[in-house]
């Protein structure tokens, strides 16, 4: 089997899995529940990654960050995955005092922060920004996605 046919077969299999798992429960519905979060967050990240690749293939590089952010929001929402664009999260001191608010690019399914970039390369400040968002919000999982280069860059970060 050629590499291209193998990729198409894998994509078809992923699409089928997204529609239904073995129990007949829709994957999207399953992702929205909080039972098995470790497996579900990985599936959610896979969906966001695959969707990002599709967007990058279609739009390529050269657009503003906002365009990629909107495209990702649109496509994930079409799949039934809740996404909040430019979501504000509170930052609190150890005694609970509000220190202010921060704004994440995308907050996906109430458990994944996605920081979108459209630059030549990811730099330490971009990573620090996402890690700061994760720490401040106490969300464990984040994706840093850069649409700005010739090749799409996606990096997952997990806070323990």
Segments predicted by a language model, with ranges:
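Nucleic-acid nuclease catalytic cores
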Residues: 117-160
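A short, surface-exposed helix-loop junction/capping segment
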Residues: 48-58
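Conserved catalytic cores of phosphodiester-cleaving nucleases, focusing on short active-site segments
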Residues: 60, 83, 104-120, 133
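A cross-kingdom feature that marks ATP-driven nucleic-acid transaction machinery
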Residues: 24-25, 81-84, 121-129
């Amino acid at each position: 089997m050629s590499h291209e046919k193998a990729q198409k077969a894998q994509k078809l299999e992923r699409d089928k899995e997204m529609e239904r798992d073995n129990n007949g429960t829709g994957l999207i519905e399953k992702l929205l529940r909080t039972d098995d979060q470790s497996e579900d967050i990985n599936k959610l990240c896979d969906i966001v990654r695959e969707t990002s690749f599709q967007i990058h293939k279609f739009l390529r590089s050269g657009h503003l960050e906002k365009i990629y952010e909107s495209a990702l929001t649109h496509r994930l929402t079409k799949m039934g995955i809740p996404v909040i664009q430019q979501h504000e999260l509170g930052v609190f001191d150890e005694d609970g005092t509000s220190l202010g608010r921060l704004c994440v690019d995308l907050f996906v399914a109430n458990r994944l922060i996605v920081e979108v970039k459209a630059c030549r390369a990811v730099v330490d400040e971009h990573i620090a920004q996402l890690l700061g968002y994760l720490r401040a919000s106490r969300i464990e999982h984040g994706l840093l996605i850069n649409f700005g280069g010739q090749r799409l860059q996606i990096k997952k970060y997990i806070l323990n």
